[in-house]
């Protein structure tokens, strides 16, 4: 069903990546790649190989690994050292399965697992460096996942960008350290959203074919008639923030940095976002 739809859409639609979706099966209740049971690890790899085959059919070389259950529900149940090595080994096997595939790690600090073993983009970059082919292992930053880790999404994105490893991004928002809410982009922290867009624009993100995704969910009160509003709103906010970035006064920014007038720079940014003159 998917491939004919892509062909019919032509250049308007493409498959960015395929994901093994390991968090939904009883085999992976206690992890897939990091499971204490060899049969579960074999199942996780089987789904990963199958995802690579599907990706090839759909014309993409990218596999995104959201490590949803790769960690511990009981801290004493697993060795973080052995578990990390299991993940590296699993990625190496995927790299060996297809010499062209790219593996993209999407980190998250918790939920549905209690304690993730690869919780931030820094962890993902370290895993990448430890594989047999680091050039084919990158990262995906989701805004809400960074916030759940108590980190700034733009800093997480910038860290991966500096290493040439930010191969996709998922924009959304999050109200503090709760469950993963996947709120519409910018609804909780507009300034934080602005800085994510600013970072991507400044670094010409997308020039090499990278995608910017909107990983957002509708509110539970949303009617079927309004079922796409969360997507429409998120896209509208992202585009509006692009316009704000285009108006950002970098000369004034530099002046404030040179004099360490961060109060002035902060207020300038707020005025820009609120549309206040002066």
Protein language model features and the residues they cover:
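Active-site acidic/histidine proton-transfer and metal-coordination neighborhood
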Residues: 9-11, 15-17, 26-138, 266-268
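Basic, amphipathic N-terminal segments that precede the first structured/catalytic domain
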Residues: 1-10
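Active-site-proximal loop/turn and secondary-structure-junction residues that shape catalytic pockets
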Residues: 19-24, 67-71, 107-111, 143-147, ...
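Short active-site-adjacent helix-start/loop capping segments
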Residues: 1, 23-28
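Histidine-acidic metal/acid-base catalytic patches
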Residues: 53, 89-93, 97-102, 117-278
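Metal-cofactor-binding active-site regions of metalloenzymes
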Residues: 1, 15-20, 194, 198
């Amino acid at each position: 069903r998917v491939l004919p739809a892509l062909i019919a859409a032509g250049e308007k639609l493409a498959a960015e990546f395929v994901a093994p979706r390991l968090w939904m099966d009883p085999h992976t209740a206690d992890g897939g790649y990091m499971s204490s049971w060899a049969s579960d690890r074999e199942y996780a790899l089987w789904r990963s190989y199958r995802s690579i085959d599907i990706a090839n059919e759909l014309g993409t070389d990218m596999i995104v690994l959201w490590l949803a259950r790769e960690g511990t529900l009981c801290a004493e149940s697993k060795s973080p050292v052995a578990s990390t090595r299991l993940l590296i080994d699993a990625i190496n096997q995927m790299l060996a399965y297809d010499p062209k595939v790219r593996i993209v790690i999407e980190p998250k600090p918790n939920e549905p697992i209690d304690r993730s073993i690869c919780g931030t983009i820094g962890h993902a970059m370290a895993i990448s460096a430890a594989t047999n082919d680091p050039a084919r292992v990158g990262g995906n930053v989701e805004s809400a996942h960074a916030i759940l880790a108590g980190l700034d999404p733009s800093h997480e994105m910038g860290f991966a960008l500096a290493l040439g490893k930010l191969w996709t991004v998922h924009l959304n928002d999050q109200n503090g350290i709760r469950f993963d809410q996947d709120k519409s982009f910018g609804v909780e922290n507009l300034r934080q959203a602005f800085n994510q867009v600013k970072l991507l624009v400044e670094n010409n993100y997308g020039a090499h074919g990278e995608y910017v995704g909107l990983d957002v969910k509708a509110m539970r009160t949303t009617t079927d008639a309004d079922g796409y509003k969360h997507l429409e709103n998120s896209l509208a906010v992202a585009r509006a923030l692009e316009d704000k970035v285009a108006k950002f006064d970098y000369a004034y920014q530099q002046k404030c940095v040179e004099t360490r007038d961060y109060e002035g720079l902060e207020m300038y940014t707020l005025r820009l976002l609120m549309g206040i003159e002066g």
